[in-house]
Amino acid sequence: MSKCAGIVLAGGMSSRFGEPKALVGWKESTFIEHIVKVMESAVQEIVVISHTDIKERVEQLVQVPVIEDMSHYKGNGPLAGIVSGMEYIDSDWYIIMPCDAPNVSNEWITILLEQTSNEYDAVVPIINGRKQPLLAAYHNRVKEKIYALLQEEKRSMGQLLSQCNVKYIAGEDVQANVDWFINVNTKEEYVQAQKDLSNE
């Protein structure tokens, strides 16, 4: 059976939100604690990629390793975070989750894992016609592709996907659970997510 690890991305600036999203309250804890807890039920190892400014606070909240982007790739967005996590944990597959998708379910991680196979480099959902590359699974062979992109100063997840053999998932499992894939980018979206939570 393939080994699978989790990489939680919490290295963004949260500029639209106005404060670090990883530390925002959610279900009697925080976004980052919630995402790690969801992942812990499905993967063997987890690492959190944190922004420098909040690393110590994140370390106090979660019981998994917390690291920053590798120094020479800092500031290069999600690709830098993903490859830093891949370097930290040696695994066959990596489940990527952002810290700002509070509705994500361990059921989704199970679906991702079921779809992985050696013929693919990545497994990515399509929600309402849009690819969601940060709620996806990547094989470790993708690491070299990321390095090549970063060396060319290319930071786009789309550029990575264009170089990969990707299995896209857009079936009923995904479309019936679009809430799993909602990102919270603004205070307004956060307020709405809390309302939706209280109405469940």
From Swiss-Prot:
GO terms for cellular component: cytoplasm. One of its GO terms (molecular function) is metal ion binding. The keyword Transcription regulation does not apply. CDD domains: MobA. GTP binds at residues 9-11, 21, 69, 100. InterPro entries: MobA-like_NTP_Trfase, Molybde_CF_guanTrfase, Nucleotide-diphossugar_trans. Gene3D superfamilies: Spore Coat Polysaccharide Biosynthesis Protein SpsA, Chain A. Its main location: cytoplasm. Its EC number is 2.7.7.77. Pfam families: NTP_transf_3. Keywords: Cytoplasm, GTP-binding, Magnesium, Metal-binding, Molybdenum cofactor biosynthesis, Nucleotide-binding, Transferase. One of its GO terms (biological process) is Mo-molybdopterin cofactor biosynthetic process. Belongs to the MobA family. The N-terminal domain determines nucleotide recognition and specific binding, while the C-terminal domain determines the specific binding to the target protein. Transfers a GMP moiety from GTP to Mo-molybdopterin (Mo-MPT) cofactor (Moco or molybdenum cofactor) to form Mo-molybdopterin guanine dinucleotide (Mo-MGD) cofactor. This is Probable molybdenum cofactor guanylyltransferase. It comes from Bacillus mycoides (strain KBAB4) (Bacillus weihenstephanensis). The lineage of its organism: Bacteria, Bacillati, Bacillota, Bacilli, Bacillales.
